Amino acid sequence: RSPFRSDELGAVVYGIWDYIKNSGKYAADNLTLEWVGSTVGKRESRRFMGPYVLKEKDVEDQTEFPDRVAFGGWSIDIHPAAGMYTQAAGTEDAVPDGVYNIPYRCLYSRNIKNLFLAGRDISVSHVALGTTRVMATCATLGQAVGTAAAYCAQHDLLPNTLYEQAFKDYQQVLLKQDGPIMGLRNQDPLDRAKLATITASHTLSELNTNTPDATNYPLDQDVAFLFPVDPKVHGFDLRLKATAKSQLTIEAYTTGKPQNYIPAALIESFSLPVTPADQ
């Protein structure tokens, strides 16, 4: 974080702003630059080695680690090693189909017995750090490590002995505190939520947008809806309004894994005739 780097980056920021403001190519007459950070924030420096090193393949395969305690969802976003003046592409992105797991073994040192890790120093490869480094993901890591540290203090454990002796119990503690552990079931027999049943007297057939000038969404291109299915969907309604006689094609896809949001496999396809009289 040398003064040169701060001055150089500041010169670039204000140079770009000068161009936006004064080139005449942008509608910026009434715009002002509100704030610029005064400290250089490094996205990557030194990382520790833990019992496991999270790799690019783990992110892309969405590996379901038994010791998962956190998750991420950012793309693998790697910036040019040569810096901002390089003529190479600005970024290299690989986007997983959905969120991925981060194991507990990446969050403590393999050779310093009482050292937890969270944030941008965790045990991941250079490429995997391109996705785990973002703030929302770092927050899940902080919760996992903070809970683990408190658990160790309460039960007189070290990070590695927690993993070896009490990990499942720790996972349940983290889960009960709304820890982001995908696919882990609540095992607490005293949790009343597990004994509850849900009933409904009515169904909602129309959403109030609270917008007086709301209009129908034109289906002049494909539109997708994503909704959870656990364990199955008995049916769904679509409200349509046609201006001409036509055919509406509906396709149903799975996403492959519960946490994904990209169509993976076609389940069924069918068409419905629609006329102006229908609604």
Give the location of each predicted region.
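Flavin (FAD/FMN)-binding glycine-rich loop and adjacent Rossmann-like elements that form
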Residues: R1-K232, T243-D278
